[in-house]
Regions:
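N-terminal signal-anchor module of multipass membrane proteins
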Residues: 9-60
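Generic multipass alpha-helical transmembrane bundles of integral membrane proteins
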Residues: 111, 140-243
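C-terminal transmembrane-bundle signature of multipass membrane proteins
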Residues: 28-34, 52-61, 181-184, 208-299
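Juxtamembrane helix-loop boundaries in multi-pass membrane proteins
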Residues: 9-31, 66-92, 109, 125-152, ...
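Structural signature of hydrophobic alpha-helical transmembrane segments
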Residues: 43-56, 102-117, 161-176, 223-233, ...
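Membrane-water interface of transmembrane alpha-helices
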Residues: 54-65, 112-123, 174-181, 237-240
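Membrane-water interface regions at transmembrane-helix termini and the short interhelical loops
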Residues: 34-41, 94-106, 123-130, 152-162
């Protein structure tokens, strides 16, 4: 009995220490499983189970330490925007469970989408209405553009139209936020060391938008796909040039930014190559090599 009490106390303390950016790793693992699925279903479900485990830890913190979670989200725009990855990860995980529990998975998927929009509305009220440029970070992309994960996963539930509407909403928000975040990074405001790894998020929104576009938009534009892919790869290269400096920093929870952005970049490129093959456009073999390299980097 004493051992049980000690164990429960340790578990309680461990859950208390789970940081909000854990949701980012949760999302990265869920997406990585889908990236690795063509190579190994075992790896896919290993990633899915690991992601779900992190989700249980974070959900437990929400239930057991609601005031701490409230303080984290109310007091820090980075944590508040990063928390959206929790709902993005749930959308991804619903594609794992759909073959086994289709109705429940679809209900949870809808719930995650609604929760993300609710978080978006609250974030706008809490941080955007009276925002200051120095408080703007790439995590803002997560709050507003991250909803496009619904577009990426929509085909699983045969909701292409809904996915297309959400894509256009998220892509419009991306165009606005890209200018805002870029202005912030070009401004004189210094970036604190713990927030520097967040720069990696820069590579995610364009690739996520492209993946959502390819998944749901019925009348696709080849020109738009090519332009989006070129921009996505350009942003990815820009992030890679900063990696040597970022990896020299001591560990921060913001290292979670190294996960999903790399995965979605590889996924978007692979989907682009697949689409070009479908419409009988010759794809340079070098692109397949790049997909392989980006998959390795994401892993």
């Amino acid at each position: 009995t004493i051992n049980k009490i000690i164990y429960e106390r340790r578990l309680y303390i461990m859950i208390r220490k789970v940081p909000v950016p854990t949701a980012g790793v949760m999302l990265g693992l869920a997406a990585l499983g889908n990236l690795l699925a063509p190579y190994s279903m075992i790896l896919k479900y290993a990633c899915g189970i690991s992601s779900a485990f992190l989700g249980v830890l974070l959900f437990s913190k929400i239930i057991l330490h609601p005031q701490m979670m409230k303080n984290d989200l109310n007091g820090n725009s980075i944590f508040a925007s990063v928390f959206a990855t929790f709902f993005m990860a749930i959308m991804q995980l619903c594609t794992y469970t759909f073959p086994f529990a289709p109705i429940a998975s679809e209900v949870v998927w809808y719930g995650a989408i609604c929760s993300h929009f609710m978080l978006m509305a609250w974030f706008t009220y809490r941080y955007i209405i009276n925002f200051e440029l120095r408080d703007v970070f790439p995590t803002y992309f997560i709050a507003y553009v991250g909803i496009v994960v619904a577009s990426v996963t929509a085909p699983t539930f045969n909701h292409h139209n809904l996915g297309e509407y959400i894509f256009w909403f998220g892509f419009t928000m991306y165009m606005i936020l890209f200018a805002l975040v870029t202005i912030r990074y070009c401004s004189k405001h210094a970036i604190a060391e713990p927030a520097k790894p967040l720069f990696c998020i820069y590579t995610a929104p364009m690739s996520l938008s492209l993946a959502g576009y390819l998944a749901c938009v019925a009348d696709k534009s080849l020109i738009m796909i090519v332009i989006m892919q070129i921009l996505a790869q350009g942003l990815f290269v820009a992030v890679l040039t900063q990696m040597p400096k970022l990896l020299k920093l001591k560990f921060y929870p913001s290292y979670a930014a190294f996960t999903f952005p790399f995965v979605i970049t590889a996924i978007a490129l692979r989907q682009t190559v697949s689409y070009l093959n479908e419409i009988n456009i010759a794809v340079p073999s070098i692109l397949n090599c790049v997909v392989g390299v980006e998959t390795i980097l994401a892993t």
